[in-house]
Amino acid sequence: MALGIRCFRLLHPAFSSYLADLSRPVSEVPMKTVRGRQRDHIQYSAHPAVPVRQFATKKAKAKGKGQPQARVNINTALVEDIISLEEVDEDMKSVMEALKDNFNKTLNIRTAPGSLDHITVVTADGKLALNQIGQISMKSPQLILVNMASFPECTAAAIKAIRESGMNLNPEVEGTLIRVPIPKVTREHREMLVKLAKQNTNKAKENLRKVRTNAMNKLKKSKDKTSEDTIRLIEKQISQMADDTVAELDRHLAAKTKELLG
């Protein structure tokens, strides 16, 4: 018998610890509670308790983490008396479209006359687009001309606006004629355009946050006459819309960056 136990202990080291517990007095052995099936009474078994938590896996501990959040899809007609989600959606889309427009008109490898059209010029009459006060034309592939003969008093302001447009342009003036040499496409120029694209994207995200904040503030005004569950659901919908727009902004930035860097 002793020889058999010795052999088993060699084969299964864990059993050695178990036998040691069995050799201890009953009073020293942790007791495990077992509820009887036939009668509703408590029985006790004198065998060592096994700490179950030792068998927990990292996968089990991580359960619930990183799980995708359930998306919300509210019928806008049902909550239009609380807030117009369609208007919120339109405002967020406007932010997206403004960034696309900015990318297309100002962030191009090759400078074209059309890229100068919407440069904002600060005049005595307010802010005006450059093409409203000057005639823009392409003199050669390396030179753009801006004729300010119709608004000569705005020539200095136009030069300042072109120089500060972020397009790496250094205009020269001859009377009321502004000459804009087109810079060569260098690696530094490409990287500068990418930097501008990131700055414009961050500004778009700031505008998006304002849209979201305004929507949330408007929603708060309805808390007294709307259930908490409904308010919470609408808040989640608005946040979801904002997150989707941010993701789209990032996708356009990535695409523009790839285009600019070649």
UniProtKB/Swiss-Prot annotation:
It comes from the Eukaryota. This is Ribosome-recycling factor, mitochondrial. The gene is Mrrf. Residues 1-55 form a transit peptide. Responsible for the disassembly of ribosomes from messenger RNA at the termination of mitochondrial protein biosynthesis. Acts in collaboration with GFM2. Promotes mitochondrial ribosome recycling by dissolution of intersubunit contacts. Its main location: mitochondrion. Signal peptide: none annotated. GO terms for molecular function: ribosomal large subunit binding. Disulfide bonds: none annotated. Belongs to the RRF family. It is found in: Mitochondrion. InterPro entries: Ribosome_recyc_fac, Ribosome_recyc_fac_dom, RRF_sf. GO terms for cellular component: mitochondrion. GO terms for biological process: ribosome disassembly; translation. Keywords: Mitochondrion, Protein biosynthesis, Transit peptide.
